[in-house]
């Protein structure tokens, strides 16, 4: 089984004016495609791992040969992270129900959660991701470097938990529109969070 670039469930301009068409198209067709290509190339000599869903593969990095571990950490990680990211974007959804209640329970308020998430995203030095994760029965905000995922576990990524939503803070995710203004990009994210997808992921794991 080879990994393939997932189709987006919307047009490249669907998130305008918050996320711009040019960035979305380049991000999807160039950056994400490269992660897919590199992961597939690394897996050609690893048939015992090649059939695993990418979300499972990245939980087994410590089982990989040493010469494949880093390339798959980076590229299978990039494929997994971006596949989640695209599905997590949509205009016009509302945070409600069980997920909203859990956020209020674990952060005190939705505003407190947003402030903590924004801080994690803004303070991630260099490239990486900010995440809302479910750890046991509690929600938490974590961040990871590069294309690391909380699914990789604390020993590898410095974080753990099941991702409910994630935000890419690599410069390629925002530089064409926002240049060096990462905090502005982070603020715009709240206008395009697919809370329905986040709620479904939460419901599947709670």
Swiss-Prot record:
Sample GO molecular function, one term: metal ion binding
InterPro entries, per database record: Mn/Fe_SOD, Mn/Fe_SOD_BS, Mn/Fe_SOD_C, Mn/Fe_SOD_N, Mn/Fe_SOD_N_sf, SOD_C_sf
Pfam families: Sod_Fe_C, Sod_Fe_N
Catalysed conversion reaction: 2 superoxide + 2 H(+) = H2O2 + O2
Uppermost EC category: oxidoreductase
Cofactor note: Binds 1 Mn(2+) ion per subunit.
Residues involved in Mn(2+) binding: 27, 82, 168, 172
Family matches, as Gene3D superfamilies: Fe,Mn superoxide dismutase (SOD) domain, Iron/manganese superoxide dismutase, C-terminal domain
Keywords on record: Manganese, Metal-binding, Oxidoreductase
GO cellular component term, pick one: cytoplasm
Needed co-factor(s): Mn(2+)
PROSITE patterns assigned: SOD_MN
Protein task: Destroys superoxide anion radicals which are normally produced within the cells and which are toxic to biological systems.
Entry-linked PANTHER family: 37S RIBOSOMAL PROTEIN S26, MITOCHONDRIAL, SMALL RIBOSOMAL SUBUNIT PROTEIN MS42
Assembly information from the UniProt record: Homodimer.
Family per similarity comment: Belongs to the iron/manganese superoxide dismutase family.
Protein name according to UniProt: Superoxide dismutase [Mn]
Annotated organism of origin: Escherichia coli O157:H7
Gene responsible for this protein: sodA
